[in-house]
């Protein structure tokens, strides 16, 4: 009985994706505590996200040109940390997808090369058998002529 190959790569990707959420939570907590991350990594994207979100909502509701107040520092740091965590999870998931795609592509390419090699050897065998058949036909004709000449 043949057992199929164990999908260790898929299991590994699943494990990485499961670990990404707690990892993102730790990075978010560190970003909230660190003044550098808070100021330069969390706040700017959060303010831009808030501005785009509020601008979109205002336009949908029909308020054009309304002034949008920036978030306070604590709210912006919290939103920025959440955005950072989601970006990390997204990047890890995307990386896993790209890795799985490249692995599948390499497997497919390898199988295709094996099939081409097998096809090439079969074609060579067919050509060899064709020559052998011609040689045997020639021998059969020679033998037949010799038998007819000997009678």
UniProtKB/Swiss-Prot annotation:
<keyword id="KW-0496">Mitochondrion</keyword>
<dbReference type="InterPro" id="IPR010754">
    <property type="entry name" value="OPA3-like"/>
</dbReference>
<dbReference type="GO" id="GO:0019216">
    <property type="term" value="P:regulation of lipid metabolic process"/>
</dbReference>
<keyword id="KW-0175">Coiled coil</keyword>
<comment type="function">
    <text>May play some role in mitochondrial processes.</text>
</comment>
<feature type="coiled-coil region">
    <location>
        <begin position="106"/>
        <end position="131"/>
    </location>
</feature>
<protein>
    <recommendedName>
        <fullName>Optic atrophy 3 protein homolog</fullName>
    </recommendedName>
</protein>
<comment type="similarity">
    <text>Belongs to the OPA3 family.</text>
</comment>
<dbReference type="Pfam" id="PF07047">
    <property type="entry name" value="OPA3"/>
</dbReference>
<dbReference type="GO" id="GO:0005739">
    <property type="term" value="C:mitochondrion"/>
</dbReference>
């Amino acid at each position: 009985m043949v057992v199929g190959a164990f999908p260790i790569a898929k299991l590994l990707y699943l494990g990485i994706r499961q670990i990404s959420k707690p990892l993102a939570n730790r990075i978010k907590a560190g970003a909230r505590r660190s003044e550098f991350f808070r100021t330069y990594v969390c706040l700017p994207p959060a303010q831009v996200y808030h501005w785009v979100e509020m601008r979109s909502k205002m336009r949908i509701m029909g308020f054009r040109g309304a002034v949008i107040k920036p978030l306070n520092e604590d709210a912006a740091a919290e939103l920025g940390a959440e955005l950072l965590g989601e970006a990390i999870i997204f990047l890890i998931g995307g990386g896993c997808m790209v890795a799985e795609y490249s692995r599948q592509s390499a497997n497919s390419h390898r199988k295709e090369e094996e099939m081409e090699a097998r096809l090439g050897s079969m074609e060579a065998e067919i050509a060899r058998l064709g020559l052998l058949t011609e040689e045997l036909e020639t021998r059969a004709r020679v033998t037949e002529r010799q038998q007819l000449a000997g009678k």
